[in-house]
Amino acid sequence: MSRAWPVNDVKANRPLGETARRILGVRIAEVYSYRPIIHRPEAVEETHALRISLKRLRYTLELFSSVFADAGSRQIDRVKALQETLGDLHDLDVRLDLIRSVADRSTPKPGGGETASDDSVAAGLARYDERERSRRQDLHRRFVEQWNEFQQAGMRRELVSLSQSTERASA
């Protein structure tokens, strides 16, 4: 799991809004540090780390919902959608690892007396693997489209605005 970026200079005697904005700013920077891997479907570990960073961003928005108000709620919906898509992608990655593991254990060893049943198991696993890889490509493409849609709609700009606002966010 990716480590959370540290949030420095948070003090208990500071106003809640100031603390919330400081934490939010760090969480936004953490999420957007993953931009270089957004279009790289092979970046499996980094994509999972992005999902965890999105989760931290969402929890920050939820924890300080009284500070960020309706503008924060809109961002929670976007972040949650991205997080869920990446969760589905991670589930597929785990499934693909499992398929490869089973296939490796199911491959007959040389001189081990391969049977027709061994061939059909290997063929079935190969088809399953191919189908799941195709689903992963489709899901990654959907994630990229979703990410791009949210960015074009101003997600980053709106998040940064929330982190810099000196007043309670409005509708």
Model-identified regions with their sequence ranges:
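Cationic, histidine-enriched alpha-helical/coil surfaces that engage anionic ligands
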Residues: 1-171
